[in-house]
Structure formats: structure tokens, C-alpha cells
Amino acid sequence: MEIIGEKINTTRKDVGKAFRERDADFIQELARKQAEGGATFLDVNSGLALYAEEEAEDFAWLVPLIQKVVDLPLCIDSGRSRPIETALKLHRGKAMINSVNGEPAKMEEIFPLVKKYGCKVIALTSSSEGGIPATSEERLKIAEDIATVAQKYRVPLEDIYFDPLVMTLSTQHGNGTLFLETLRGIKKNLGEAKTVSGLSNISFGLPKRKLLNQAFLLLALGCGMDAAILDPTDKALMAMISAGEALMGKDPFCAKYISAFREGRLDA
């Protein structure tokens, strides 16, 4: 499973403070810790920026700063094309855009960048017009529409990470099964495509969140989820991923599990 580290997000209080003060050491240490925890991508979100020009300047500072200390690709987390392109111009390696959705105008804005820079992209199974669909069938239809537009731009399906959308159980008890149904549908209908989720959304507003997150992770792994946006410094969660991949036949000869044990990464 690919792990997208979620912690470099300026809407988080401590990160926002460090960012405003241009505390390079804090940001770089956060990047290092996530890399050491097992992240394969680092999400970078400049959510404090009110304007596109300001956000572009933020990414111009963040991208080189982070890639100076970790040899990982970044997931450029923004809804605006100008800041995204600023980040992509500075990025070393194959980046990921977070995100596009099923809105036609948004797809026509983002997919040219995906093609131009040869990057990956997270695709939300929603649209700005209709919001988040209430059924797996509607979400699958949006995923298929996105795949059609991607084909027009000759974006490989394997570079698209569809997000079936995790919504909290606290507002609707069926949200977990809805996500899993959509996930299975994407793997069946768009087999070459990847899938991703913002894992911790499932437990928002509920007690013992880590317990729910771990259980949900195993269910999603069993349905074929390829990547997750999560906290890679959460040792218990990362240990659960190692165990889950071994049990589900995704770790040949349990090599990664044994390696994690030898490195002390299962002692959560």
C-alpha cells in the first residue's frame, strides 16, 4: 500500500504557526519523521492561503524546502491550477495532484497539467454541482466519466487514484459499507486505476478513533485499496498495514512484515 503522509497541512495549528514564521527546521523535521515512518508520498497543503498568487508563493517555498531533506515525491494539495503548476515546475520526480473531481470545468483545468508534467492525480468521486453522491452507483458513474476525460488527454488510468469518499459513521451508519461498495466497483470496472482514501474521516466525532481507523483500514485493504492518506508516524496503524498486507497475500513471503519486525516497527 502506498502511504501519503498527511501532516504538512497549514490548517493544522502547529504547522500553520511554523509556516507563518517560515520555520524551515520544523517543516523539514515533519517531512523526515513521515519518511522514516514509511510514507511513500508527502501531502503538502497550503490551506491558509486566501488567493492563488499567495498559495503559489507558498508552494514555491515549501516544495524545494521539503525535497531538500527527503527523497520522496509530493502530493500537491490544492484546488487551484496556478499554485499547482508552480509546485509542479519546482518538483523533482513524479508528483501527485490532490485533486480533481467530476465537474467538467475542473477536469479541463487539471488534466492538462497531469499530462504536461506526467504526474499522478487523486480523483474524487463527486462533483461541485451535485456534491457527494449518496449511492455507490452514482459515485461509480462519476469515476467512469473522469476516466473518459482522462483518456482524451492520454492520461494513463494507472496514474489516477480514485477516492470513493470516506464519510464519518457518526452522521450515517452506512457510510463505511457505501465506501467499500464503491471501492469494489472501481476495482472491478476500472481495474488499472488505483484507489485512495482519507482514512481517518470514518471515525470523526466518535470515541476511540484509532480503533475504528485500524479496523476500517483492514476492511479497505481486503477490498483492494491501493493507497491511503494518513499519519505515518502512527506506529500502531503502520504496524496494522504491515500485518494486513501479509495476511492478504500482498507481501510475498512476508518479506516486508519480517523487515518491519527486525527494524522494530511492529512494536506499537
Locate predicted features.
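Glycine-rich, proline-tolerant flexible connector loops at the mouths of alpha/beta enzymes
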Residues: 35-72, 166-176
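Catalytic alpha/beta core domains of metabolic enzymes, predominantly
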Residues: 116-263
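Structural preference for beta-strand elements that scaffold enzyme active sites
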Residues: 1-3, 40-43, 71-75, 94-97, ...
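Active-site-adjacent beta->alpha loops and helix N-cap segments on the catalytic face
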Residues: 51-61, 78-86, 102-116, 131-141, ...
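Extended, intrinsically disordered, low-complexity segments
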Residues: 1-17, 25-28, 37, 230-268
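Catalytic beta/alpha-barrel core
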Residues: 43-46, 72-80, 95-105, 125, ...
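Short, acidic/polar
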Residues: 23-34, 106, 145, 212-217
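Active-site mouth loops of central-metabolism enzymes
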Residues: 3-29, 53-54, 98-102, 130-137, ...
